[in-house]
Amino acid sequence: MRKGKGAATLSIPAAGGEGTLDTQSASTTTPVLALERWLARKLLELSGHPRVSIVLWNGEEVPGAAAPLARMHIRDRDALYRLIRHPYLHFGDLYSVGRIEIEGDLVQFLETAYRGFDSARDTWFTQLQHLLNRPRANTPADSRENIHHHYDLGNEEFYELWLDREAMQYTCAYFPDPGMTLEDAQRAKMDHVCRKLRLKPGDRVAEAGCGWGGLARHMARYYGATVRAYNISHEQVAYARGQAAAQGLAGRVEYVEDDYRNIDGEYDVFVSVGMLEHVGRDHYRTLGAVADRCLTEAGRGLIHSIGRDQAERMVAWIEQRIFPGAYPPTLREMMEIFEPNGFSVLDVENLRLHYAKTLEHWLARFDLHAEEIERIFDGAFVRAWRLYLAGSQAGFLAGTLQLFQIVFTRG
């Protein structure tokens, strides 16, 4: 929860009523029942036997696979029962308030957990977890609220602490050299996009979902394009306008606080980097129709989006606590943008390991500023966001998450 006023907050229910560990229920003297040992073993079984062991509140260890990569400490009895009922939601809540702790590397723990769940994807238990997760809608009003929840947490006092310092890119960087700095890799990503689009001086560009506006400014400054960029986050648009004015680009970059559905005018290039995850799969044809409406006959475009290996919703905790309304599509689902509108798909690239590397940089910077972030928000917020960043990195490493860049033209 944010300690100040005026920005979005992260709502993490106090799983035990207080949001802190109940020392009595977590006491090492609290007995472990035979049923609870069985439940812990069953949880590992239903999770696909990940290389994890469970340590219960009395210190008793329930072994999982041989040579576990990490140990999950469950600090009280109620936490175990909550975890059994809905692990995809309650693990994140319990970890955030300290009632579950991980011994070992958090990313490695989550990666082996994802691989385990992936192997158990078709079991009744996994299917039930997905049924329990009800996604938010993506109407224009809902989209604005969903974006506010995640992005309007404070530009300078939060995101600037751990994103790249030049362009505030909250999307996958590009690492042609693994030893690159985050700033160099984000600049390389923007050049990679511009080269794919064959961007040249005088091109008119429509950008759907511009974040803090770094790509639009890069296109204008280094490629001579004129860019109109749309975004429904008030804080991001205000920041982007200020940066454009300070860099002398206000005459070549226009930031519009409006929904992508309302893009108007005629353009040579249509680009969207990191917005499709928020569109919702029922609206892919709408996005394609917008691109079709505004592109010239020789127009070309690029969509850059987090995706999935199989069609399913986000983990319930991410959907309800971190990224409401988000849905990463499969490659097949993304074709709904292009095929109904007669677009030709020229190139598809998967940059998932580049995103894992990007998240490694973000997580390191986030941890470097964790005490400062805790002073702004609180300890539960820090633990929740550490889990979110580590879990995202693990998802890309395990291959459950993808990063697709698709280039298209009219024909």
What does each of the following model-derived ranges do?
Residues R2-M180, D184-Q186, H192:
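Feature captures hydrophobic
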